[in-house]
Every structure is written in C-alpha cells, then in structure tokens.
C-alpha cells in the first residue's frame, strides 16, 4: 500500500486513507488529481458514480466518480478503493469528495449505480441532490427480467424499439405517447382466484 501512496504523492494526487480500528490494515483509499479538482470546482452540478465490484487483481471494489461539463463532456474526478461495499465505506468516500470542494456548491444531480448502500450514502452526504438511475443499469435489468415476458421475438423487438423511443423522448408529449404505447402492448398476467 505504501507503494501506491508514494506513487500518488509523486504524481501530485491528493489522497486520504483510513485504517481498521486496530490500525493494522488500510480499509479505504480516496484519491483526486489537482487538475480533476479544478474541473470539479468548475462543474460541480452532475456526478456519475460507479463501483466496479472485484474486477481488479486484488478483488477490491473501485469507486469511480465522474463529472460532466457544460458541453456534456465527462471527466474523471476521483477514485477510491474500498474494503467493503457498505454504506459506511461509500459515505466516507463521498465525505472526502465533499471536503475537496471546500465551500463550492454541491452537485444538483447524482447518477449512482443501483447499489443500495451507495445510493444511501449519496443521500446522506448530498441530501439536496436529485437522483437519477443510470440508463445502462436500467437496460441491463430490462434484458434480465423482461425478456421472458414476451412470447415471440417480434414482440420483444417491438418492445425494445418502443422502449428506445421512450427513453430518447425529448418532449413530454412524445414521452407520454411511447409510455402509453408500451403499456398497451405489455403482456398481461391473468388474475388467479
């Protein structure tokens, strides 16, 4: 871990870490580059937060925090390695992020992944922010849970087309149109008595 800290310091990152209660083990590490911090201060309105679970060599969750500029370009704000995927760990990470803002305004919109602990931590640290679910995660759930409801490939494809139109609607009228169209075409479950 000391090698990581030395490397972060060498390339100019600001970083924080916390250890276990007995001080024998590093639990969580948060790091932010000064240039990312400057962008974050200029564009604090939208946060995208994703935790990649155990995809690295050491099987440690990596939290990525991304910002969005006024021209819709994304930029990396910060990263954190956390020992557990619990609200306490995510809260600590988000508190470090908030601390890095000093007195700059807080995010208005946060798009977390669907992890309940992360969503609760966001609500704790940034209570005034609005939340939106990530389209990619919603789409994955549709593929996972809805496909079996459609008896034919044609009906499934029609649903996916209508779903795409719904989520890409640019007006309330279009949204309501596609919403009602999807509702009217959804398979109905028969009432059991």
PLM regions: where:
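Extended amphipathic alpha-helical interaction segments
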Residues: 1, 6-11, 15, 98-101, ...
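A short, conserved beta-strand element enriched in hydrophobic/aromatic residues
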Residues: 65, 75-82
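Structured beta-rich ligand-binding regulatory domains in large eukaryotic signaling proteins
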Residues: 70-73, 86-87, 113, 126
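Conserved, non-catalytic sequence blocks in retroelement Pol enzymes and Pol-derived host proteins
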Residues: 52-55, 81-87, 111, 148-150, ...
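Active-site beta-loop-alpha junctions of metal-dependent nucleic acid enzymes
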Residues: 56-58, 79-103
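Eukaryotic short linear interaction motifs
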Residues: 39, 55-57, 71-75, 89-90, ...
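Structured nucleic-acid-interacting core domains from mobile-element enzymes and related host factors
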Residues: 1-63, 68-70
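Short, conserved catalytic/metal-binding motifs centered on acidic residues
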Residues: 49-53, 74, 110-113, 137
């Amino acid at each position: 871990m000391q090698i990581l800290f030395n490397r972060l310091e060498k390339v100019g990152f600001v970083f924080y870490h916390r250890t276990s209660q007995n001080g024998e083990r590093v639990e969580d590490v948060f790091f932010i580059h000064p240039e990312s911090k400057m962008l974050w201060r200029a564009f604090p309105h939208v946060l995208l937060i994703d935790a990649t679970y155990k995809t690295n060599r050491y099987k440690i969750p990596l939290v990525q925090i991304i910002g969005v500029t006024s021209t819709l370009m994304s930029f990396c704000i910060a990263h954190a390695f956390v020992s557990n995927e619990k609200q306490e760990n995510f809260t600590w990470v988000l508190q470090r992020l908030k601390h890095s803002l000093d007195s700059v305004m807080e995010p208005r919109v946060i798009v977390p992944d669907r992890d309940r602990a992360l969503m609760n931590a966001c609500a704790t640290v940034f209570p005034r922010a609005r939340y939106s679910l990530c389209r990619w995660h919603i789409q994955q759930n549709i593929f996972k849970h809805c496909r079996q409801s459609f008896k034919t490939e044609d009906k499934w494809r029609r649903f996916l087309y209508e779903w795409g139109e719904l989520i890409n609607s640019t007006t309330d009228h279009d949204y309501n149109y596609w919403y009602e169209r999807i509702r009217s075409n959804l398979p109905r479950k028969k009432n059991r008595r």
